[in-house]
Regions:
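Short hydrophobic/aromatic-rich motifs at helix boundaries and adjacent loops
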Residues: 1, 20, 38, 156-157
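Intrinsically disordered, low-complexity peptide-like regions
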Residues: 4-5, 22, 118, 222
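Short helix C-cap/helix-to-loop transition motifs enriched in small/turn-promoting residues
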Residues: 72-79, 108-111, 121-126
Length: 254
């Protein structure tokens, strides 16, 4: 179960480096320029179906997190992300009681955690992600285990540098030692306040103790036109992960 929770956190960090009046034909250039020191709260929810020990299990996870832009220099914004609360349930009382003990340990550990990322005006993470507020041994463990997520986010370009209009599509690709990803994005709608972007892609996580993980993802998200931030409640995605013949299906919203 702890390994599964780590996988969810990896997905969150991964995932983590995503109206009114149509404006057909308008070309826009996306910029990530959030207002400094103005927190944005997201409610991450996931329903995951998997097979554990020959039994089908459905797990629900809820995580409340806060992202705060704290500084900006040369077009790069520093973001501090905190996990404010988290819970998980399977609908099985015995399993939930056992999981609650681990969850309380996670919550206590995460209560002081600040995930620090650097994001440029294209919305891409740059540099190294740091994990502040943790005991040294845990900080080192996070840095080691999540390093692949940082490298992956740094290489994957979510928005093109050229202007795009409603109906335009573009691709994002990254290939490395730990992960490969090929994704296609489409600007579905442009309004005065928001950009609606759909996405679909395939991802391969390599060099994992549990074997190579193949993931497909499809979903959509809205971005605030003024700040470039994801609009809370608009991110929706469905994922399928396969490893060693086992399949995990997830529905995610944020």
């Amino acid at each position: 179960m702890k390994r599964f929770l780590h996988f969810l956190l990896f997905s969150f960090c991964l995932l983590a480096a995503i109206a009114c009046g149509k404006k057909n034909g308008e070309k826009i250039t996306y910029r990530f320029v959030p207002e400094l020191n103005k927190p944005v709260v997201y409610n991450f929810k996931s329903t995951t179906e998997m097979n554990v020990g020959g039994k089908d299990v459905s797990m629900q996870m809820v995580m409340k997190m806060q992202m705060t832009p704290t500084a900006r220099e040369n077009g790069v914004t520093t973001i501090s992300t905190q996990i404010l609360d988290m819970s998980a349930s399977t609908g099985n009382e015995e399993a939930d009681r056992s999981m609650e003990q681990s969850m309380q340990q996670f919550k206590q550990l995460f209560s002081t955690l600040h995930i620090i990322t650097q994001v440029n005006e294209r919305g891409n993470t740059v540099g190294k992600t740091s994990y502040e507020g943790l005991p040294k041994e845990y900080a080192a463990m996070f840095q080691s285990q999540m390093g692949g997520s940082t490298d992956f986010s740094n290489n994957l370009k979510y928005f093109p540098e050229y202007p795009i209009g409603q109906g335009d599509s573009w691709t994002g690709k990254t290939h490395g030692d730990k992960a490969d990803c090929d994704a296609t994005y489409t600007l579905e709608e442009v309004t005065n306040d928001a950009l609606t972007v759909s996405f679909k892609g395939k991802m391969t996580l390599k060099n994992n103790p549990q074997g190579t993980i193949h993931i497909t993802v499809e979903g959509s998200c809205q971005y605030n036109r003024k700040t470039g931030m994801n609009i809370p409640g608009t991110f929706k995605a469905e994922t399928k992960a396969t490893s060693a013949g086992q399949q995990v299906k997830s529905t995610v919203s944020m």
